[in-house]
Amino acid sequence: DDVTFTSEGATSSALDHVSFTVPAGATVALVGPSGSGKSTCASLVPRFWDADSGSVRVGGIDVRELDPHALMEQVAFVFQTNRLFRASLADNVRSARPDATNDEVMAALHAAQCDDIVAKLPQGIHTMLGTGGAYLSGGEVQRVALARAILKDAPIVVLDEATAFADPENEALIQRGFTALAQGRTVLMIAHRLSTVVGADKIVVLDRGHVSEEGAHAELVAAGGLYARMWAEYEQAAAWKVANTQASAAASDTATQKGGEA
């Protein structure tokens, strides 16, 4: 509520009198150009930093009045760059809730669309990851991070660039895992790929530290503002990618046919 925040050493505010609400049980997406303040907003929820002025409230209570440990128990994170420990897959997921059983770990992995990961590992969930063990791709690591967040079962979830570095196949799996994670929870999501926020209950558009507009996807497209321009650019880029892929496939087919004729 009316939050202003300036990073240490910065000459201008990252957030300037920003206000928006995330209703309980809703998914709210933050979008905007690079440097608009999306990740800063997400970082203020768990008090990675504190606002210079204004307030960030969880359940109506200013986060600065909450016990830090209790606050962290209320929030699960899926970061832009997720890290796994040099430990088994099970222990990596179980770090969110150390008393979880193997069955609960498996259920979280299943919900996060990680069945293929478990199946390919030589010792399943007991396979060591990292140095001297198995390695996972960036998209696979993100799915394991989703499993960790699902197992934690916190009422609030913050996803920062959850699909930023995923390939198309992993992005689809991550989206299904996110759907499972979002069930019954309050979600604050930050993403550059606009396709991932279309189904959000509300989209808050940030621009240079200010709230430019907010509403549902269809409402914002119809409004013709910054979000509509971003969506048009996204659709244009997607159409170009499809056309380029089709052209490459056609050229490959032509080359194959000529090779066969020779």
Named regions from a protein language model:
Residues D1-A262:
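ABC-type nucleotide-binding domain
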